[in-house]
Amino acid sequence: MGFGLLFAGYTMLLVWGMAIDPSIGLGFDILPDLVAYLLFWKGLHGLRPYSKNFVYARYLTIPLLAAGGITFAAQSVALLGKFVPAIAKHWELLLTVINTVDTISVPLLLFFHAYLCLGIRELAAEVELPKIVSRTKVAIVLSSVYYFGQLLVGMVPLPGFIHMMLVLLTFIVYFYYLYMLYSCYMHIVYADEEPKEVFNPLMSLLEKMKKKDSDDE
């Protein structure tokens, strides 16, 4: 249906990087956002029939894919500078390119999350899952605060503790989306499948979590 691919995409959006030049804040993303956007594009393909909002969210993955490609290319060239001194001379230019693309991506991501949540809310309401409907409202608020904060940081010099709060909020937002997408998979997708024999402890744990969530509903 697509929720599994969206879940995988959000794990790629988490910050897993290595430093190239810490003095200017240049790094390389080990799990590139480009892969996350590809997973979003593919995952939303399966969700298109259920809401126009999923269609709009999928449209937004196209410019995000372009942005992710530029960022990955710039980071890859910068990484070569660790071994090629001639490239290292242009690290600040590459960092400017990366920061510019990141700033442009912020409003795109804000609208992407809004359309994604609206689509999930519409689908959850249709299958009568009020808890997931409520989770989409929380997700919209969290992502709005986070991305508006990112825009503010890009325009106005702010104290260091604000940056630290945004880093913390990054993990809160993405883990909340992972939790919400897991709920969608278990209650919307997995609930429609035929029961299968449990072959391993992981599947057994998922079954128990599903039963607990069902009891809470």
Predicted regions and their residues:
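Alpha-helical membrane segments in multi-pass integral membrane proteins
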Residues: 107-115, 132-153, 168-175
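Extracellular/periplasmic helix-loop-helix junctions in multi-pass membrane proteins
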Residues: 86-90, 151-172
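C-terminal halves and exits of single transmembrane alpha-helices
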Residues: 65-113
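Membrane-interfacial loop-to-transmembrane alpha-helix junctions, especially the N-terminal start
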Residues: 1-6, 51-62, 135-139
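Hydrophobic alpha-helical transmembrane segments of multi-pass membrane proteins
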Residues: 25-35, 100-111, 162-172
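N-terminal topogenic module of multi-pass integral membrane proteins
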Residues: 1-43
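Internal transmembrane alpha-helix with an interfacial aromatic "cap," most often the third helix
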Residues: 33-66, 71-79, 112-126, 184
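Membrane-helix boundary/juxtamembrane motif in polytopic membrane proteins
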Residues: 117-148, 187-206
